[in-house]
């Protein structure tokens, strides 16, 4: 007998994201976050970089997780959501971010881009496929994408001090699989659960 998938859709807005969850989303307190049931969740988040930590918490609330799995997934999701928002939706290049950080103008540039058209209306779409033994997250931004094959190898001694690619490396080391689509604006991670 096949087990049906539960589907829940969550959309963030300018208000508190936690208040937008539908009542049928399994909650820790209710004891309904059973790992034996497959679950598909879809989310649409506004490009609000300062709320990435809160978004990660929302994404991980669906299931009770082993603490190490939660830590590793949290790290991967944080890095990939930041990339999707900053470099994807806001189209801020790695070089522009590095320069802004060095000059102390990063917060200003981020605020300006976040309120300018067409960037301010862009969203990050996340789909989570939970099964009893693994989870897959697909993160899609509305930017132009990037050539993920051209990321410098952050483990190469010549690149150790570069900022570019470090978040992707951290994410890759935290999950079992990380793949991009051809355009580079959709990334999928897979993590086997303990």
Question: Predicted segment positions?
Answer:
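Bergerat-fold GHKL ATPase/HATPase_c domain
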Residues: 2-75, 86, 90-114, 127-129
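Conserved beta-strand-loop-beta-strand hairpin that lines the nucleotide-binding pocket
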Residues: 27-40, 85-194
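Conserved polar catalytic motif of the HATPase_c/GHKL fold
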Residues: 79, 83
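Alpha-helix N-cap/helix-start and coil->helix boundary motif
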Residues: 77-78, 186
């Amino acid at each position: 007998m096949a087990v049906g998938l539960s589907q829940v859709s969550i959309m963030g807005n300018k208000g508190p994201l936690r208040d937008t969850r539908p009542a049928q989303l399994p909650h820790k307190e209710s004891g309904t976050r059973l790992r034996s049931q497959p679950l598909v969740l879809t989310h649409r988040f506004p490009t609000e970089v300062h709320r990435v930590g809160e978004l990660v918490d929302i994404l991980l609330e669906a299931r009770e997780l082993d603490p190490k799995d939660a830590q590793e997934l949290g790290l991967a999701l944080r890095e990939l959501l930041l990339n999707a928002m900053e470099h994807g939706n806001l189209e801020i290049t790695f070089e522009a971010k590095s320069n802004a950080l060095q000059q102390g103008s990063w917060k200003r540039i981020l605020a300006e881009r976040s309120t300018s058209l067409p960037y301010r209306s862009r969203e990050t779409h996340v789909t989570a496929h939970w099964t009893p033994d693994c989870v897959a997250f697909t993160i899609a931004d509305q930017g132009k994408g990037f050539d993920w094959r051209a990321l410098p190898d952050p483990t190469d001694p010549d690149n150790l001090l570069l900022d570019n690619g470090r978040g992707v490396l951290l994410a890759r080391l935290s999950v079992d699989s990380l793949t991009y689509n051809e355009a580079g604006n959709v990334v999928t991670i897979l993590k086997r659960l303990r």
